[in-house]
Amino acid sequence: MSFSRPSGRTADQLRPVRIERAFTRHAEGSVLVSFGDTRVLCTASVENRVPNFLRGKGEGWVTAEYGMLPRSTHTRSDREAARGKQGGRTLEIQRLIGRALRACVDRNALGERTITLDCDVLQADGGTRTAAITGAYVALADAVNLLLKRGDIKKHPLIGAVAAVSVGIYRGEPVLDLDYPEDSDCDTDMNVVMNDGGGFIELQGTAEGHAFRRDELNALLALAEKGVGELFELQRAALAG
């Protein structure tokens, strides 16, 4: 029997990706990013303050928050605010987004400012954290470009681009950019964050069904490099538009 994916995509094919800039009115940067049916609103907000541990050091800070709308999935989930605390998954993902974006910022060039990336999942169909990172980078770029245009900073603080994609082993085959049916039924699931210099910022990989081999890991990383390369092209095209 020949291998096929539920979506009909080839093993190395991304879902259709759209990056819509200036999606909301008030934020210094805002992007609606779509990976197939996964849609995440990413906004960048600039504040002229830094956390206490950075006061007086002349450095800026980049951080992130992540959340899912109650009906972003098949069944409604209570808002975390109604529960009184954020869940472990939410905290893990927003820390990942913050780490990924700080990896592309010269915080000295930013000055004593904080840029907060709010990533709100409007609709989830797998890969929300990787979509959030990819879209949040573009929102961040718009925010720092505005700071430069206003003369608030003198030097561009971005030292590269960042994007992320999921890969996994689905029915024995390495595949790129898992959607929900694949993610919920895969043997291995991995999230890969990279910069546009070819460097890896973070790898998150877990065997769900059976342990993966070194050759399978190599195949997954090769797929991720291909996919992230395509995402960098889409980011550049969006920022040039």
Swiss-Prot record:
SUPFAM superfamilies noted in UniProt: Ribonuclease PH domain 2-like, Ribosomal protein S5 domain 2-like
Binding-site positions, phosphate: 89, 127-129
GO molecular function: 3'-5'-RNA exonuclease activity; RNA binding; tRNA binding; tRNA nucleotidyltransferase activity
InterPro entries tied to this protein: ExoRNase_PH_dom1, ExoRNase_PH_dom2, ExoRNase_PH_dom2_sf, PNPase/RNase_PH_dom_sf, Ribosomal_Su5_D2-typ_SF, RNase_PH, RNase_PH_bac-type, RNase_PH_CS
Origin: domain of life: Bacteria
Assigned keywords, A-Z: Nucleotidyltransferase, RNA-binding, rRNA processing, Transferase, tRNA processing, tRNA-binding
Catalytic reactions on record: tRNA(n+1) + phosphate = tRNA(n) + a ribonucleoside 5'-diphosphate
GO BP, one annotated term: rRNA catabolic process
Enzyme Commission no: 2.7.7.56
Reported function: Phosphorolytic 3'-5' exoribonuclease that plays an important role in tRNA 3'-end maturation. Removes nucleotide residues following the 3'-CCA terminus of tRNAs; can also add nucleotides to the ends of RNA molecules by using nucleoside diphosphates as substrates, but this may not be physiologically important. Probably plays a role in initiation of 16S rRNA degradation (leading to ribosome degradation) during starvation.
Subunit architecture: Homohexameric ring arranged as a trimer of dimers.
HAMAP family per UniProt: RNase_PH
NCBIfam families associated with the record: RNasePH (TIGR01966)
Family: Belongs to the RNase PH family.
Record's protein name: Ribonuclease PH
Species name: Xanthomonas campestris pv. campestris (strain ATCC 33913 / DSM 3586 / NCPPB 528 / LMG 568 / P 25)
